[in-house]
Amino acid sequence: LDPDIYFYSSIGQIFKMLDECNILLTPHITQILDKGLSDSPENIWHSCGMYNLGFCGLKRSASALQMLKWWHARLRNDCYIDSYNFLYTDQKWMDFLPSFFSPQELKISFNLGMNIAPWNFYEREIFEEDNQLYVRSRCNKDRKDRVIFVHYSGYDYKELKKGGTVQKNILNIKKYSDIEKILFMYGKAIIENVEIFDYFISLQYSYGFYSNGNVVTSVHRRLYRSMISKGMKDDNPFLINGMFYSLLAKKKIIVTTKSNLDKLTKQNFPNAEKKLRSFNLFMKMLFSILGYERYFLLIRLLHPYSRLESQIHLLDDKYLDNNIH
């Protein structure tokens, strides 16, 4: 379970499902609706996978152990987000499971009360009946389930504690009056457990800093991964007297505070339109110099070159002709 999940009724229903299967998954979305009705574009599921790994149910069995062994072998080196290599942390690997296991071994739950989350708020409506929370399809009112758990993914939890609502992952999410009620309920639960909440929300990620306190950025991680794949050996990359940190320091790719680069998106990039215009004018000039064929060959090359992993030539000249994977 992810730590941002809140249960509203007994998990006994989940154990009953596991009596009849060995592996239990919940899809991000479960209903066919007209294009454009969802709060996030449908093609996002091609990137992050059809099943949400905020929840996964397993029963000790041969097939579950087989799956865990298979999964473990892949997560050792391929548990991160990289659209170029079609990876999305531990989650996207689950798309393989329906091809591996029979319906008796693997159950895909269509219970609307499981894994209610921002990505499916548009298809699920919360309502109260006999002092219990239920959920039904917004387009098919006859279908309903008891609310088991809600996954409050992507919210600013400090804002929820103050009574506000900020969804950081789906920027243009619609306001649903029924969802506002369960957001308020979660905020109230945070306040009721404020000491525990404040303690854990203030903790910093143990592997987010080098031994001298400088910040490990996403750029550093991806450069390190690339250099390891090229054969570099560094037993502890967090030590400032290690090979990797020494290369970063020498090339001035070290930051002392959290990098703004990690936070930048297309939506919050400052003066994006003005900078895009300037860049496009430069590319037009380059097109006039290179001509049609060489320009578009360059554009094709820039796809793999633009990956952070391909910038290892900045650290060591020996990668000047061997930096693209």
Per-region residue spans from a language model:
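Glycosyltransferase catalytic domains, chiefly GT-A lineage
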Residues: 1-325
